[in-house]
Amino acid sequence: MRLIRALILGSPLGICAVAQAVYAPIPDQEQGKDLTLSLEAGITYNSNIFGAATDAISSMVYEASPKISLNKSLTDQTFFSAYYRPTVDYFDDRPGEKTLFSQALDARLAHAFSQTSTLDLTDAYSYNQNPEALLNGAPVNTDQTLQSNEFDGRYTFAPTEKLGLVLKARSVYYDYTNPTLGDLLNRFENLYGVESDFALLPDVKLAGEYRHEDVDYTNDPSENNKHSDFLMAGFDYAAGPKLSASLRIGGEYRQYEGLSSTTTPYAELSGKYDYAKGSFISAGYTYSLEETSDPVHFSDEKVNRMFVNIQHAVTALVVASASIDYEPAVLVGRPLASDPSQVQGDINENSTHAGVALTYVPTKSWTISISYDYDLVSSGIASRDLNRSRLGLSSTVVF
């Protein structure tokens, strides 16, 4: 089971981020060697293992997760990294199968054609029998296995000293192995975009961006498919190594197969402040249309997402972290397939995800963490409600 671990290391704004160097930071435990082996083991109390709105089932969960990582410079200009991580979860009180197996395989290839031109390709495959994000409103069943793959590509170049261009693409495939869930939710999400930035000041870059997205469900009805065009502008601000901010605002024009098209605003805002060594605070806000877990009754979900992350180095060996993610949303109703003359009304749904963690690092190759995570969903449809707490203790050893 993958807990939030209290700290959200990434954000929905990642696609807007300024291109990073080819040699992205390698975790401290993996520096200085090409091949790294590690083992994580932990125990967690989960108050609602199926994410049920009522009659929640709780259980102790025991986890073991070995990992093999490779970080290698193939040439002076080419870097390759990959890892494979299988995970075994055992549930004391889970109906049906008590032992679940998951695995993740990630790979990255980065090449610098010159000091101003880089290509970065990543692929992430996941097979998860115990997914972190359970499906609101889905009938409770013992199989929510999700298989997914995400491919990302970025080509960054600078025609002039002040002008930068980025070509980007992302393709994601979601495959629920349960036939009932798969018929509703299996899909491809493909995103393509071009971004340009101009260095107005040493610490300020103006940015403009166009994106196109296709969401194609693998099963009928085809009216679940949609196609979007985004146009946005904003800036990236970096006042030295400690303070940074990014803003994108614009609009999305979405066309549906079988429904009327719509135009909505789009916004992304984030900021980060490193106030001490090993300590920072970051926060952000996004507004967007997203896919729902019930495409039969709802076409989209209008989501306001606000998040705050804090990491504080208590001592050289102890790190505390906390995060909160609040998402007030509106599920947009659609005509019912059984009777198109009837339209499902819009539904308000608020989600809160919060966590805290304390991590002890006695040596460079050993960490011990205790964490608490809380998930709350309050929906206008009672069957979509969720209340879940998880308390975990884990340890990781790097060999």
Cite the ranges covered by each PLM segment.
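Gram-negative and organellar
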Residues: Q20-F399
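Cleavable N-terminal export/targeting peptides
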Residues: M1-P27
